[in-house]
Amino acid sequence: MVPALGNHDTFKADNYPDFKTGGSGHENFYDKYLEEAALADFITGDAKEMFKKCGYYHMTKPTRRTQHEDVPKIKFVVLNTNLYYHNQYDLDPVDPCDQLKWLRATLEEPLDNSTRVIVVGHVPPGFFARDSYNMVFNVPCNGECINDEFASIFRNKSLSSGVAAQLYGHDHLDTFRLFRDEVSETVRSSVFMAASVTPALYLNNVPMGVNPSVRIYSYDDERGIIMDYDQVICPMKAVYGIIYSTYIQNSQAGSFTVF
């Protein structure tokens, strides 16, 4: 298990403190997730110390359970993007928690040929799929400075070259994002967003409904590359059973990484 904090993992929701601005509430805030929510069972070693800072960390795991040291590995870079979503805490206006600075430095670290990076977060970059005027990152500076800097990292060829995929949720919709090179328009990184188990969905505070679903990714454990995913959907209007729908496949989409 590789835990990532969500925007409802605080009370009140959406409020994550920034150590750079100080104030009440930050001291030992993230420690409590390790101690009281038992995340220390999964976030260990140096990753634990990173997490205590502001809820982000990276951790490298083998692609399969084995005693061999030469097995391919996945470096999970786990972000706390909840910082940028309706956060009521006083935030640094440029880079709350120095997370983007840390992300850039982490992606600059050299990788061996057998290691791939998967970036994981809850709140995704970009705009809400059903409302092109609603940027998901909305604080600080209305989210624009954060979203632009975030995008610049993954549009950069050298920084994104080792990133196999980015995985997010939050929007309760099955959708995706693409980061294109600003000059060549080449797709540098892909973001995959799974729908939600809960049927709740709100657009401008108006309740809507979605069919609950679960996504199961498959990957090549020899190369550490995500190959495909199955989307399992439970239609709310169905009287019996669960309908299994695998509607994004290599045979249909042509490529998992670039649509």
Outline where the language-model segments fall.
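Short catalytic/ligand-binding loop motif for oxyanion handling, primarily in non-cytosolic enzymes
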Residues: D9-D14, Y85-N87, G126-A129, D174-R177, ...
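Binuclear metal-dependent phosphoesterase catalytic core
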Residues: D181-F259
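Short amphipathic alpha-helical interaction elements and helix-loop-helix interfaces
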Residues: D14, R65, Y85, E109-N113, ...
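Short, flexible loop/turn elements at secondary-structure junctions
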Residues: L5, D9, T63, N80-L83, ...
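Extended active-site neighborhood of metal-dependent phosphoesterases/phosphodiesterases
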Residues: M1-A105, V187-V191
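Short, glycine/acidic-rich beta->alpha junctions
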Residues: F51, N142-I146, G209-N211
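Residue-level detector of short, conserved catalytic/binding motifs and their immediate flanks
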Residues: Y57, V117, A164, P212-R215
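His/acidic metal-ligating clusters that form di-metal
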Residues: E69-V71, K75-V78, Y89-F192
